[in-house]
Design a protein with these regions (language model features):
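N-terminal small-domain helix-loop-helix segment of the aminotransferase-like
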Residues: 2-104, 112, 288-291, 395
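Helix C-cap/helix->beta junction micro-motif
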Residues: 30, 140, 195-196, 318, ...
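Conserved core of the PLP fold type I
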Residues: 66-193, 207-222
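PLP-dependent enzyme catalytic core of the Aspartate aminotransferase-like
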Residues: 86, 90, 94, 124, ...
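Hydrophobic residues in well-ordered beta-strands that form the structural core
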Residues: 125, 146, 202, 356-358
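Conserved core segment of the aminotransferase class I/II
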Residues: 222-302, 309, 313, 393
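Conserved glycine-rich beta-strand-loop-beta hairpin in the small C-terminal domain of fold type I
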Residues: 282, 286, 301-312, 322-335, ...
Length: 395
């Protein structure tokens, strides 16, 4: 038999393996020192109480003859889809129930959506980039081109009219840089996509961190986006579902290519290859959008926002350039002293006992930059920020 040779084209990812080895070596050499991890991309606050209660109630319901649920609708139960509709409507965006598809997370949908598109399409991704965008397309054999970003454009790449792309990845607020597009910038991308008959895959996993009312929480706040974009969303960061697994994707009915409805194709794909998200999980997700759920979730988000401000304030005191933090859980900083990304990693670990993520691990344009996250413990984040501030000032 023949294998998919494109898997052999995947670059070996040593980023987090190397981080783990370096941290282990440091701990062995300095067993008395406490290491603070600010490189984690996972949440640390527990699920909201109302979410846990909803799971308990749904599990108990499943234990009764009257309340048992077997296979559910592949595209999600109406009660959750309607709750998501209300979430969009509360921000002034109207989405139809049959445009919402419940999934086991954004990462799955980002990969599975590609099955609707031919492998001859050209893909445009930013650099630095969330590695999954690249790997998903390498394994399909698509051509990938990069939108190079840097300090000069705030790590927000803009359309290049000399470049023709068919599939465009946008993540705003961005992972890893924390940068967020303005409405005007998103409109430029929408116009570019429509002009080139391209489709935007809009990763909105971090929209819940946006506190600036001038920034869009959804691509569908932008005129024309319903004709060129799919929005992929997650419960992981808004509600701490990284270990529970639930997300959703919005596919507008207006979105068509070559006379085919992307909405209908995605429905067919899901009903063919996916059996849906468990009833208990969907009940938990629906609880997120209740009045008490939103209040509890905001409390957790504020916890992470305070952590981000603590880190940002420390960098401000040191005069270190950074982006993100305000509308994002990620702080993307310029390595002080013109250090390279891994050089700064070693320096930070040795001098501060703090672990972050070297920017070069996200692409060539990440060299000389570094990612810190706000997902840690509040007291440890304060301690880490103080250590970083003291050490940088002593450089």
């Amino acid at each position: 038999m023949k294998m998919n040779k494109h898997y052999n084209e995947l670059k070996a990812s040593y980023l987090f393996v190397d981080i783990a080895h370096k941290v282990a070596a440091y701990q062995e050499a300095h067993p008395e020192k406490e290491i603070i991890r600010l490189g984690i991309g996972d949440v640390t606050q527990p699920l909201a109480k109302c979410v846990v209660q909803a799971m308990r109630d749904a599990a108990a319901e499943m234990g009764t003859k009257e309340g048992f649920h077997g296979y559910g609708p592949e595209q999600g139960y109406p009660f959750l889809k309607q709750a998501i509709q209300g979430y969009y409507a509360s921000r002034g965006t109207q989405i139809a129930e049959d445009e919402i598809f419940i999934s086991d997370g954004a990462k799955s949908d980002l990969a599975n959506l590609l099955g609707l598109f031919d492998v001859d399409n050209t893909v445009l991704v930013p650099d630095p980039v969330y590695p999954t965008y690249v790997d998903d397309n390498v394994t399909d054999g698509r051509k990938i081109i990069y939108s190079r970003t840097g300090q000069e454009n705030g790590f927000l790449g803009m359309p290049d009219e000399s470049v023709k792309a068919d599939i465009i990845y946008i993540c705003s607020p961005n992972n890893p840089t924390g940068a967020a597009y303005t409405r005007a910038q998103l409109k430029a991308w929408v116009d570019y996509a429509r002009k080139n008959d391209a489709i935007i895959l809009y990763d909105a996993a971090y929209e819940c961190f946006i506190s600036d009312g001038e920034l869009a929480r959804s691509i569908f706040e932008i005129e024309g986006a319903r004709q060129c974009a799919v929005e992929i969303c997650s419960f992981s960061k808004i509600a701490g579902f990284t270990g529970t697994r639930c997300g959703y994707t919005v596919v507008p009915k207006e979105l068509e290519r070559e006379g085919m409805s992307i909405n209908k194709l995605w429905l067919r794909r899901q009903t063919t290859k996916f059996n849906g998200v468990p009833y208990v999980v969907q009940r938990a997700a629906a609880a997120v959008f209740t009045e008490s759920g939103m209040a509890e979730i905001q409390s957790n988000l504020d916890y992470y926002r305070r952590n981000a401000k603590v880190i940002a304030d420390a960098l401000d005191e040191c005069g270190v350039w950074y982006c993100g933090g305000k509308n994002s859980p990620y702080i993307w900083l310029r390595c002080p002293g013109n250090m390279k990304s891994w050089e700064f990693f070693d320096w930070l670990l040795e001098n501060c006992g703090v672990v972050g993520t070297p920017g070069v691990g996200f692409g060539e344009c990440g060299e000389g930059y570094f990612r810190l996250t706000a997902f840690g413990d509040a007291e440890k984040t304060k301690l880490a920020a103080q250590r970083i501030k003291t050490a940088i000032k002593a450089l």
